[in-house]
């Protein structure tokens, strides 16, 4: 089962106080690319961390 967290979680992150959300990488066969993850999160001034099949962005 695919882990869909993209847009919905992004909106939840904006609303929520924690601001932690994750990003899907459908083009990489579900694998998280560390470089892409960090680049994506950096655009929003977040830190990116890879998990097996998604990228999670943390504030700071």
UniProtKB/Swiss-Prot annotation:
Cysteines paired by S-S bonds: 32-50, 37-55, 41-57
Record-marked site positions (Basic residue of the functional dyad): 49
UniProt site positions, description: Aromatic residue of the functional dyad: 58
Locations listed in the record: Secreted
Position of the signal peptide: 1-22
Keyword terms: Amidation, Disulfide bond, Ion channel impairing toxin, Neurotoxin, Potassium channel impairing toxin, Secreted, Signal, Toxin, Voltage-gated potassium channel impairing toxin
Protein's name in the database: Potassium channel toxin MeuTXKalpha3
């Amino acid at each position: 089962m695919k882990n869909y967290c993209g847009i919905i979680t992004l909106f939840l992150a904006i609303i929520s106080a924690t601001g932690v959300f994750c990003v899907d990488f459908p083009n990489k066969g579900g694998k998280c690319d560390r470089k892409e993850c960090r680049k994506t999160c950096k655009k929003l001034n977040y830190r990116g961390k890879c998990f097996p099949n998604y990228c999670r962005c943390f504030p700071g």
